[in-house]
């Protein structure tokens, strides 16, 4: 893994490196089960993350990692190098603030990470992304996060059309800049005109309505 990290580091000028370390559903199973039985899954996780973060710091990088696992035991953040940034993510329209709160209370440096709602969808969940991004940016301000990282994923072969993520990307810029912004419909009209060249100002509202018509998503079609 460290050799792979060094190969990747050589390709980018940034001083940041995201080791990911999220959704570790299989940790403590298979070959790692005896060690997990001895140490516990959370200890197994944090020891490995710590080793990679310390390696990155020694290489002059600022480590980042996704926070979905550590939020179950947020006090473990104190064991990581002080340069480490926790990427606290959540993509629901009514995303709860628990994860952002507990990581802030534990003293973590964190970015709040909403999403544009395109992955596994025929059409981006436009209204969902508007609500999610507004909420997560609000949590970022409330808990003094160091930044916002707006995400766009491409699960299961990236069926989602990249151009349809533009509204969510613009919502991220708008809400991370400040709390006072236009309502959903008004902002969508501006995005339609400026990002898509639609003089009627209705294109993004049509996108939002199209998303509401979906009977099943790409995950259901592809996996289930």
Where are these regions (language model features)?
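Short acidic/His/Gly/Ser-rich catalytic and metal-binding motifs that mark active-site loops
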Residues: 26-31
């Amino acid at each position: 893994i460290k050799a792979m990290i060094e190969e990747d580091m050589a390709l980018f000028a940034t001083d940041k490196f995201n080791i990911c370390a999220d959704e570790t559903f299989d940790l403590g199973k298979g070959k790692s089960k005896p060690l997990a039985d001895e140490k516990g899954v959370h200890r197994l996780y944090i020891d490995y993350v710590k080793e990679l973060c310390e390696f990155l710091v020694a290489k002059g990088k600022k480590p980042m990692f996704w926070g979905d696992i550590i939020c179950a035991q947020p006090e473990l953040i104190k064991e990581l190098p002080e340069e480490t940034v926790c990427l606290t993510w959540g993509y629901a329209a009514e995303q709860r603030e628990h994860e952002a709160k507990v990581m802030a209370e534990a003293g973590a440096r964190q970015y709040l990470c909403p999403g544009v709602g395109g992955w596994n969808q025929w059409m981006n969940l436009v209204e969902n992304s508007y609500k999610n991004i507004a909420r997560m940016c609000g949590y970022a301000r409330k808990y003094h996060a160091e930044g916002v990282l707006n995400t766009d994923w491409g699960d299961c072969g990236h069926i989602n059309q990249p151009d349809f993520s533009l509204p969510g990307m613009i919502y991220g810029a708008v809400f991370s800049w400040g709390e006072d912004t236009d309502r959903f419909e008004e902002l969508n009209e501006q995005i339609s005109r400026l990002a898509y060249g639609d003089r009627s100002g209705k294109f993004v509202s049509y996108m939002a309505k199209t998303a509401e018509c979906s009977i099943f998503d790409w995950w259901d079609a592809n996996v289930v």
